[in-house]
Amino acid sequence: MFTLKKSLLLLFFLGTINLSLCEEERNAEEERRDDPEERDVEVEKRFFPAILRVAAKVGPAVLCAITKKC
């Protein structure tokens, strides 16, 4: 009877630790996913280089058309 209680206690303890670790990991993933500041940074990283490339290609043509010095 004592060995049965001991093994059940061990299983309960290990299960509790496992659930605790899973909950912490899930909370960390939710924080990463729901963080609006991080999402804004990702959007900035994605769109600013594209905007700069388009401006670099179109900019000289626009300046040439405005100043008429080509």
From Swiss-Prot:
State which tissues express it: Expressed by the skin glands.
Q: Which GO terms describe its cellular component?
A: extracellular region
One short Pfam name that applies is FSAP_sig_propep
Which GO BP terms, alphabetically?
defense response to Gram-negative bacterium; defense response to Gram-positive bacterium
Domain of life of the source? Eukaryota
Q: Which cysteines does the record link by disulfide bonds? A: C64-C70
Q: Which InterPro entries match?
A: Antimicrobial_frog_1 (IPR012520), Frog_antimicrobial_propeptide (IPR004275)
- Statement: the UniProt record of this protein carries the keyword Heme: no
Chief place of localization: secreted
Asked whether the keyword Secreted is assigned, the reply is yes
Could you identify this protein by its name? Brevinin-1S
Organism the protein comes from: Odorrana schmackeri (Schmacker's frog)
